[in-house]
């Protein structure tokens, strides 16, 4: 997906169209709720997933939505071909 968005950003930039990626960490919703429901110990799984993030919690759906809204705004008008991590610091802790 990242390579596709980079290619699209380069191709569409001359037309004023910006293409970016949003890369969330664990989000407290959707698939995470399914995983928690299937777990023998959902509270322990929630604690472990939260502990993976230096901010100490999983993302909320609104955390990801707010990042997308910002990228769509005029405040991000000069940003294209970028990946925005919305991961509570997960990558800085686990990118070795």
Q: What are the functions of these language-model segments?
A:
Residues 1-5, 19:
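Conserved catalytic Lys-bearing alpha helix of Rossmann-like short-chain dehydrogenase/reductases
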Residues 10-14, 77:
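Alpha-helical segment proximal to the catalytic Tyr-Lys
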Residues 15, 20, 82:
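Rossmann-like NAD(H)/NADP(H) cofactor-binding core
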Residues 24-34, 86:
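Short, flexible catalytic-loop segment of classical short-chain dehydrogenase/reductase
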Residues 53-64, 75:
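A conserved structural motif in NAD(P)-dependent oxidoreductases
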């Amino acid at each position: 997906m990242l390579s596709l968005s980079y290619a699209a950003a380069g191709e569409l930039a001359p037309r004023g169209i910006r293409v970016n990626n949003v890369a969330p960490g664990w989000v407290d919703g959707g698939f995470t709720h399914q995983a928690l429901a299937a777990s023998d110990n959902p509270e322990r799984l929630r604690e472990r997933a939260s502990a993976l993030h230096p901010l100490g919690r999983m993302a909320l759906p609104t955390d990801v939505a707010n990042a997308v809204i910002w990228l769509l705004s005029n405040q991000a008008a000069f940003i294209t071909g970028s990946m925005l991590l919305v991961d509570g610091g997960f990558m800085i802790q686990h990118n070795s």
